[in-house]
Each structure stands twice: as structure tokens, then as C-alpha cells.
């Protein structure tokens, strides 16, 4: 699966892998975090398997990199997505909100209190939207963003991830000028720096949240014993 392809022959699969490798290097060297790639070679990985790889490694974040395409040759700019559950009715969610197993690699499973595998992301929608917002802000400072910019959609690659997850369309390969940009190492570096900083900002926001919650708990008066 080569994904989308530009007029000059640039292929989505090649650019996304290049950016992913550079992002891994940046995160590991600057933040000291471990990055797990869903693929590190020219091979096809099914959408469900991508989420399973993240779940199997108990990842804290899931970032899915893509390149957009359009029938309009003038469409341009990056778009950031987080999961939308608008296509799932409240009845479906309530019926399936119970203990289920989440598939992992090698045919193994792990029991967790969430909805069905297809709706695993439901418990992380708010944090996914928070991360997507940070990605949008940081990319906007560095590259051209599409008018749609920050969006929510029920992407299959996101719904199975049992952690905050975002999908980033780095630009439109159907636009000849943007195809040239996407192949540029300078452009790729701006994308990497934007994603790196968004991870830093997201991590800091979680630290602030934990400190606030911890402070609130410590300031609560002790519960009185019943006579």
C-alpha cells in the first residue's frame, strides 16, 4: 500500500517513514523517551495492527502520520485530527461500556474496563483533543495549515488505540508545490520540531494537572468517622 502519490511520483509511504524516523530520533535524543514505530521499513501494516502495536507496548501516546490528497490541485496545508464519536450513538456506547479484552500482538489480549475494541479510544477522547490542539498550535507556527485545520473524525486507525491519539496529515501531495515541500528535509524538520514541541507541551500539561489534583486531595479535610 503506497498510500497517495504526487504528480512527480512522490509516495506517501516514503515521506511518512522519513518523518517518523526523524521524529523518533528527536524524541529519544531530546526527551529520553522510547519511541515504538508501527513500521520501520517499506512494508504494509494493517490499521488494526497499528493500534495493536501501540497497545502491546503500553504506549502513552499514538501519533499517526499521513499525507493528504485531493481532486483539487490547489488544496494545501496540514490538518490535525483526533477521534470523533459522533458516528457512535449513546445507546451503542452504553450497551458496550463494560469489561472487554483489547487485542494485542501475537493473538494475546488484555482485560480492561472500557468499551469494545472498536471503541477503545472513547476513554481518551478529551486528552486526544488536548494533544491535537497542541499539535495544531505548534505546526501552525512552522508550516502552512489547511483552512480546516483542527478536525475530529472516526478514523479506524485511531479508534482502537487505548491511549491519547492523533492523526496528522502533513500536507497535500496532490498539490505540485506542496509535493516539492514534502520532499524537502527543511520542511520535514519543521514538522518534526512542531510534533516534538507538542509532545513536550502535552507532557507539561499532564504534570500540571497531576500536581493540581494532588494538591486538591491533600487539602481535603479528613472524613469524619461515624459514631
Protein language model features and the residues they cover:
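Active-site-proximal helix/loop segments of hydrolytic enzymes
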Residues: 7-227
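Short, surface-exposed beta-strand segments enriched in small/polar/acidic residues
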Residues: 1-7
Amino acid at each position: 500500500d503506497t498510500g497517495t502519490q504526487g504528480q512527480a511520483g512522490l509516495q506517501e509511504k516514503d515521506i511518512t517513514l522519513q518523518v517518523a524516523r526523524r521524529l523518533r530520533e528527536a524524541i529519544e535524543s531530546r526527551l529520553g523517551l522510547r519511541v515504538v514505530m508501527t513500521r520501520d521499513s517499506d512494508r504494509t501494516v494493517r490499521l488494526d495492527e497499528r493500534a495493536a502495536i501501540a497497545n502491546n507496548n503500553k504506549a502513552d501516546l499514538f501519533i499517526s502520520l499521513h499525507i493528504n490528497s485531493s481532486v483539487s490541485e490547489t488544496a494545501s496545508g496540514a490538518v490535525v485530527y483526533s477521534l470523533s464519536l459522533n458516528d457512535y450513538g449513546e445507546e451503542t456506547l452504553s450497551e458496550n461500556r463494560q469489561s472487554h479484552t483489547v487485542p494485542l500482538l501475537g493473538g494475546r489480549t488484555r482485560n480492561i474496563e472500557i468499551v469494545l475494541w472498536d471503541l477503545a479510544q472513547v476513554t481518551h477522547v478529551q486528552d486526544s483533543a488536548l494533544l491535537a490542539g497542541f499539535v495544531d498550535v505548534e505546526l501552525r507556527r512552522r508550516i502552512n495549515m489547511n483552512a480546516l485545520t483542527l478536525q475530529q473524525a472516526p478514523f479506524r486507525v485511531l479508534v482502537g488505540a487505548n491511549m491519547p491519539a492523533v492523526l496528522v496529515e502533513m500536507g497535500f501531495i496532490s498539490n505540485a508545490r506542496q509535493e516539492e515541500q514534502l520532499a524537502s528535509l527543511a520542511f520535514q524538520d519543521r514538522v518534526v520540531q512542531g510534533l516534538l514541541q507538542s509532545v513536550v507541551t502535552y507532557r507539561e500539561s499532564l504534570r500540571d494537572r497531576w500536581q493540581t489534583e494532588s494538591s486538591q486531595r491533600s487539602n481535603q479535610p479528613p472524613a469524619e468517622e461515624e459514631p
